[in-house]
């Protein structure tokens, strides 16, 4: 991937309509946007979920585009849960300078921006550049009307405003990625200065809450690739072949991560597991390494590897110091948000690679299964959707004698093998 810098344009459909001043309190503020309640019966307000927050470092000017939730609180005010993210670092820098943080919430963006905004990138890497690389062309940006920021010219809706660094206020509860309601906490808020939008703007949302969800799917797509790059390229571990995260068992893919490896030594495995556990805050609470024949997107195969490749007292490690994120097991009810964020968690590392060569997978060899499939299809039976392992294959512990005797068996000449066994009789001890 080669990042491509954005290009500045003079105008765009994102600013076909401009709402400022009294308009914001006369039916053309946040109340004109049809924001749904994501978890009816539990959420305390509508929340922006497909909100791509745009800010820039007040010292370097480098942009950050991140997807963070926002509680709608008034026609001209929304909350924002971002203090633990890169945008939160911008906020703290502005707080030290005694100035508000300018921000724009961009809704309805091209896919490359949406994917870039949900990927965990280095702090000083501009997501606009990643979006350009994904799209193969520069992202067109226009200047905001009331703040000094550049936003995507083709967006559906742009909410401009300033975030106080002097005050924070209650935010939440909201249905969150672990599959549980997030508690009420204290968070910053944005005071809207302008809303621009297309003439016939379409509001887009991400249904979040219990996984798998729209938000978990878009997040884990980018996260898999970022962790793969971290392990194979940044950490220089060529044994790493692929990475999968499982939102169907762990919420948004943050907690459960599986690494496929071409194992040559156990050192490469533990290096990969420790690097994965150290990735970005609360991600990868459970890290599992498996061999190259395991389908890392099939939970059944992963459990097979854990069940028969792992000696628990040798192949399992717990590492401390993980960020808890929104993991409810890390702190009891009633703990203030600013305290819970500092509560240390831990990670479980499992080496589920085979410790030595194993006998073949106990299914018929591939050619026999393929012939069975042909017969099945000739009979017009329902379409088969085989999943690995659907045929037997060698795992290293199989002798030439084993191969020859198996060939004799399928030819019907297993009597020969019986005679060999008879010739090698011994008395029991």
Please annotate each region the language model reported.
Residues 1-429:
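Extended, highly charged
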């Amino acid at each position: 991937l080669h990042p491509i810098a954005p290009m500045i344009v003079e105008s765009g459909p994102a600013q076909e309509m401009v709402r400022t001043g009294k308009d914001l309190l006369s039916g053309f503020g946040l109340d004109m946007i049809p924001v749904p309640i994501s978890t009816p019966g539990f959420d305390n307000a509508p929340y922006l979920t497909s909100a791509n927050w745009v800010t820039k470092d007040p010292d370097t000017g480098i942009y950050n585009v991140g997807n963070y939730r926002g509680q709608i609180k008034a026609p001209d005010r929304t909350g924002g849960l971002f203090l633990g993210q890169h945008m939160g670092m911008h906020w703290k820098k502005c707080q030290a300078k005694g100035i508000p943080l300018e921000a724009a919430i961009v809704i309805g963006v091209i896919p490359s921006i949406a994917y870039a905004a949900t990927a965990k990138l280095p702090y000083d890497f501009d997501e606009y550049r990643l979006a350009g690389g994904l799209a193969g062309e520069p992202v067109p940006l226009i200047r905001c009307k009331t703040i000094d920021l550049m936003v995507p010219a083709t967006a559906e809706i742009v909410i401009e405003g300033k975030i106080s660094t002097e005050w924070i206020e209650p935010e939440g509860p909201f249905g969150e990625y672990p599959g549980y309601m997030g508690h009420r906490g204290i968070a910053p808020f944005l005071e809207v200065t302008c809303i621009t939008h297309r003439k016939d703007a379409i509001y887009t949302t991400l249904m979040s809450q219990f996984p798998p969800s729209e938000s978990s799917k878009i997040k884990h797509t980018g996260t898999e690739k970022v962790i793969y790059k971290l392990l194979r390229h940044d950490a220089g571990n060529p044994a790493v072949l692929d990475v999968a995260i499982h939102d169907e068992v762990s919420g948004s893919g943050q907690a459960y991560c599986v690494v496929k490896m071409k194992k040559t030594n156990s050192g490469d495995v533990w290096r990969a597991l420790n690097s994965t556990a150290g990735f970005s805050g609360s991600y990868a609470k459970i890290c599992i390494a498996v061999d190259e024949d395991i389908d890392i997107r099939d939970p059944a195969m992963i459990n097979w590897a854990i069940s028969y490749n792992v000696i628990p007292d040798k192949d399992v490690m717990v590492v401390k110091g993980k960020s808890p994120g929104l993991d409810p097991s890390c702190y009891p009810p009633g703990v203030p948000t600013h305290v819970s964020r500092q509560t240390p968690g831990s990670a479980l590392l499992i080496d589920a690679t085979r410790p030595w060569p194993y006998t073949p997978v106990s299914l018929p060899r591939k050619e026999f299964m393929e012939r069975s499939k042909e017969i099945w299809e000739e009979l017009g039976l329902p379409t088969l959707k085989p999943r690995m392992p659907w045929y037997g294959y060698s795992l290293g512990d199989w002798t030439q004698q084993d191969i020859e005797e198996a060939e004799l068996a399928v030819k019907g000449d297993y009597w020969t093998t019986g005679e060999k066994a008879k010739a090698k009789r011994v008395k029991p001890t």
